[in-house]
């Protein structure tokens, strides 16, 4: 098993990379199956030792590695399932689903759901609306499976129903005043749930753990090697990814049975190297990047990514390829990372410096890097040692 992990909205182990942060101490699911011990070596299920658990939730892969019991990990999976039942906007019967189908009427919800909606609205306000929980109608237009950009008219019509100010939450109710508008907590829920998983493990006496919920990474204590976790931040290499996507789509288009393997062999893919490796203990690492989901519009040849600007209804056009937020809570990292990309490097650096307990690593589309924010976090994670990175003060 590797000694390195990565982050991006990542996997787990001592070292990780990011569209999510991830850890090199974490094996792939297939390698984990190959490494299963024989029945005579299996420890007692309640014995505290390093254990790993992969599971699917929130429409993404989740991973936990911890010095814990099997029961501890069972509790983690159960907790995530509970939050999915509450917060999913696509699962019939969830609180968010009920709010979106209430046709403008105030809806009774779990107090925790209402509290998270209020917290999400706080980040909407703090970011001047660059983080917006009412983007669902717009996001549906940018169908990454159809690989076709929506018309200007469709975007304009969807924008009429976008605006976080249409949402209100009390202690146990939520209302969206525009019946055509919808909310989704996808931009903050995984961070919030990662924090709750952290709290659960702490309550169960777990001190050392790596938590990755679809790339929202939280690390606790030390890795199995007795030192802080290493988290690798993915290098966006935006232009190479654009070319790769173009070649892949051309290969798919000319093959009657799917991907033309011969064309893909010509891509010359190299083993991915992280843009940097952070040293982390008791910290959250959340990365948003324009390389996470994108498609080539066959009609125009343009590449569109998934980070939408609520002001224009289109993929943002800032100079940033990724933003990695280092913070004490994953809720904060999730709530800030996407907005920072839309802001662009200069504005994002100024914004993160205003936050008291967070720092950020910015990678621009041309590959240059900058760091800004809480100096103690930057020094603790060795982010200030990133080769060539500008330290914005």
Residue ranges and their predicted role:
Residues 1-393:
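Mature catalytic core of soluble alpha/beta enzymes
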């Amino acid at each position: 098993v590797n000694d390195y992990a990565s982050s991006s909205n990542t996997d787990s182990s001592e070292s990780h990379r990011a569209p999510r942060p991830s850890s090199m101490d974490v094996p792939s699911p297939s390698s984990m199956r190959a490494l299963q011990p024989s029945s005579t070596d299996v420890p007692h299920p309640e014995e505290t030792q390093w254990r790993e658990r992969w599971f699917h939730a929130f429409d993404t892969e989740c991973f936990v590695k911890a010095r814990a019991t099997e029961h501890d990990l069972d509790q983690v999976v159960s907790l995530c399932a509970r939050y999915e039942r509450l917060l999913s906007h696509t699962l019939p019967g969830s609180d968010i689903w009920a709010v979106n189908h209430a046709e403008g009427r105030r809806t009774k919800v779990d107090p925790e759901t209402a509290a998270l909606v209020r917290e999400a609205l706080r980040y909407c306000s703090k970011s001047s609306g660059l983080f917006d929980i009412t983007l669902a109608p717009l996001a549906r237009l940018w169908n990454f499976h159809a690989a076709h950009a929506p018309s200007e008219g469709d975007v304009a019509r969807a924008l009429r129903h976008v605006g976080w100010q249409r949402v209100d939450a009390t202690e146990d109710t939520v209302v969206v005043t525009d019946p055509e508008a919808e909310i989704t907590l996808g931009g903050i829920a995984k961070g919030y749930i990662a924090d709750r998983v952290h709290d659960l493990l702490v309550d169960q006496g777990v001190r050392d753990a790596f938590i990755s919920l679809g790339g929202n990474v939280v690390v606790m204590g030390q890795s199995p090697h007795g030192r802080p976790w290493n988290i690798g931040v993915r290098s966006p290499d935006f232009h190479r990814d654009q070319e790769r996507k173009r070649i892949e789509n051309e290969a798919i288009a000319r093959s009657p049975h799917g991907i033309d393997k011969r064309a893909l062999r010509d891509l010359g893919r190299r083993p991915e190297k992280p843009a940097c490796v952070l040293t982390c203990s008791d910290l959250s690492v959340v990365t948003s990047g324009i390389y996470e989901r994108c498609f080539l519009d066959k009609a125009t040849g343009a590449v569109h990514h998934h980070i939408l600007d609520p002001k224009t209804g289109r993929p943002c056009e800032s100079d940033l390829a990724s933003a990695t937020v280092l913070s004490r809570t994953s809720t904060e990292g999730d709530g800030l990372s996407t907005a920072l990309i839309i802001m662009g490097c200069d504005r994002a650096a100024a914004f993160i410096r205003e936050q008291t307990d967070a720092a950020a690593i910015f990678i621009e589309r041309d590959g240059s890097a900058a760091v800004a924010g809480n100096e103690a976090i930057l020094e603790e994670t060795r982010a200030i040692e990133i080769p060539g990175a500008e330290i914005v003060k």
